[in-house]
A protein has these predicted regions:
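Peripheral, non-AAA+ core regions of ATP-driven protein-machinery
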Residues: 1-152
Length: 152
């Protein structure tokens, strides 16, 4: 099963749309991240695995693939952690639903850490019809600069 969430990466001060596609399928228990993922994104593997188990869920013991599209854009950010984790929980049947934009780096203990480049991302989200955004509490003041979205 696979799920997909909208997200972004920054090129200068411009937010570029990115789709975080998360797939879980039968096979060897490997975890791959594809789509020009930089070092901080590759390190998400350990943060996501630890955060899921620290939060009382089971990390899927199956083949796991995350595709960050478009592939031609290099991604050097850690805010894909949250949509990856939620995607794995949905795809493995541990959660039943989730929607909206989800942004945040995960600590090994499951704590949501703040992200950078938020205002251009939220403007992009609003332009694309997004209504709800899940983000770290530390980013709420900055998020308040962009009206028309509901923040959790």
């Amino acid at each position: 099963m696979s799920v997909s969430f909208p997200s972004y990466c920054l090129q200068g001060l411009t937010a570029i749309p990115v789709q975080v596609e998360v797939g879980v399928s039968p096979g060897m228990p490997i975890f791959s991240i594809i789509g020009m993922a930089g070092t901080s994104v590759q390190e998400s593997k350990d943060r996501v695995r630890s955060a899921i188990t620290s939060s009382g869920f089971s990390f899927p013991l199956t083949r796991k693939v995350v595709n960050l599209a478009p592939a031609e854009v290099i991604k050097h950010v850690s805010h894909f952690d949250l949509p990856m984790a939620i995607g794995f929980l949905l795809a493995s049947g541990q959660l039943s639903e989730a929607e909206g934009w989800m942004l945040g780096e995960l600590g090994l203990n499951g704590v949501l850490r703040p992200v950078s480049g938020l205002v251009p991302a939220l403007l992009l989200a609003r332009e694309n019809g997004v209504k709800e955004v899940v983000l770290p509490e530390e980013n709420l003041a900055e998020a308040g600069l962009v009206e028309g979205l509901t923040y959790y």
